[in-house]
Amino acid sequence: MKFYTNVEVWGGKILYRGVEEGRRVRHRVDYHPSLFIPSKTPTKYTTIHGEYVGKVSPGNIRDARDFVKQYEDVDNFKVYGNTRYQYCFIADEFPGTVDWDITQIKIANIDIEVGEPDGGGFPEPDLSLIHI
């Protein structure tokens, strides 16, 4: 059994935490995402508008970011694909339904109580202006 508990992009790598064969694992993965570019010949990939696109792999995550940036201002040339590479990694590594085992996942909840800001209501959590 294999499932993920957290996947993040850090720099040009995927930081992966999960459970494999009942053991917790952590890995730095040199992931190579796929992107898609317009194709004049029919392929098995199309855009949501029915236009054919071809699959390309520019390299690792940094290379993929550079590829997207290189073509972002080029007229009549679009680069398609998900640039949230952690989700691409999950889709590639865990296709279909993930077989989760809740007994293997550590779950915690932290709830703090804070005072009320002047004028009532709820404080802005990003500002941390109210005492705990």
Q: Whereabouts are the PLM-identified features?
A:
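The two-metal-ion catalytic cores of nucleic-acid processing enzymes
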Residues: M1-I130
